[in-house]
């Protein structure tokens, strides 16, 4: 009698605003067959952040589930995605829809979590491989500076605090979601600093970073100001006691 194989399920969240040019290449690059060989099933959720192009149509045609977040802002899209992950999933992965990150590297982010080494993995561009034209020297210095400050001030060992490539144990997402308030591009800084305050075990894995397809939606001055404010504000942030108790109960399971 044959025993049916049990697979662990990975929910991939891709927040998108007008990413028609890059989303097809991203969706076609996920290693579904390799993942299945290693005991995982990948399901993709594209969060359409009120796009004016055909992002949602392209994603749906390629087999992704499409969620709709009408209020613009990356933070809004990510929170919508987090809130929509079904309980049946073991892990949650997030990456951008502009083809800057390699979906083929997803299993390298999952492995440290699956082995019990940590609850959260950050895909580090700064310790990975940057393709020419993917990041300016100014942006690279800014990312390095913020990552250094977060390590020093928050006591968490991360090497790229503003990355857009993350993996979580699903329970870590459930603990984090109630505390997220950011609407826009400060969401990565909010996630990392609050995860540090929540006591999550975070690990960095080098990833490849490519030039984006399409125009950037980041406003260098306005968004940099919001990111700095988020870093400063969360220095004094503390989670509620019941959240920490919930984390301890998960860790004991």
Where are these regions (language model features)?
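Short, well-formed alpha-helical segments that are part of the catalytic scaffolds
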Residues: 19-35
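Acceptor/aglycone-binding surface of glycosyltransferases and processive sugar-polymer synthases
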Residues: 70-72, 76-84, 91, 103-185, ...
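A conserved acidic beta->alpha catalytic loop
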Residues: 48-56
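Hydrophobic targeting segments
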Residues: 8-14, 23, 30, 43-47
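Hydrophobic helical membrane-anchoring modules
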Residues: 1-8, 155, 179-253
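Short, structured coil segments at secondary-structure junctions
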Residues: 61-63, 198
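Short beta-strand-to-loop acidic/aromatic patch adjacent to the donor-nucleotide binding site
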Residues: 89-100
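Donor nucleotide-sugar binding loop of glycosyltransferases
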Residues: 19-22, 51, 74, 99-102
